Amino acid sequence: MVVFSQYATFLRRLAPHLAGELGLPVPILHGGVSRPRRDAIVEQFSEERGPGVLAVSLRAGGTGLNLVRANHVIHFDRWWNPAVEDQASDRVWRIGQTRGVVVHTLVCPGTIEERIATVIENKRALAGSVVTSTETLITTMSNDDLAAFVSLDVAGATGK
């Protein structure tokens, strides 16, 4: 399991709590971890006998990590940009992976996190409608219709 948070300071509090509850070590990866230490943590996590839980800051989670041993992702707090969360989740789910990955997102009702979740869903819907649009108006217009569509209506623009 990989737990993502945007706050390294929060992970420093969460990891000892999880370690106490689960009875196993919970390493922390964040932007301040040196490259050699980061590589050692990832290698240890990737081993079958390695720790079953890894706490990762969102920003550290978006820079070339391969955490496919996990099959659960927990986003503890939300980030405004859904692509950042997606990129973090993609550290666990990679092309060619045979096991499923379940992504859990924690949101407390009535908080700013709930509002952020709404903004994120609206952004996803907007991006989806732009990318997967089935609108065919432009592709089915005649040349005359297209020319009229893109031409400037001087009278309408100036009110004259």
Predicted regions and their residues:
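SF2 helicase/translocase ATPase core recognition
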Residues: L18, L24, R37, I41-V42, ...
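Intrinsically disordered, low-complexity segments enriched in small/polar residues
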Residues: L29, G62, A155-A157
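Long, largely alpha-helical accessory region at the distal end of helicase-like NTP-driven motors
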Residues: V130-K160
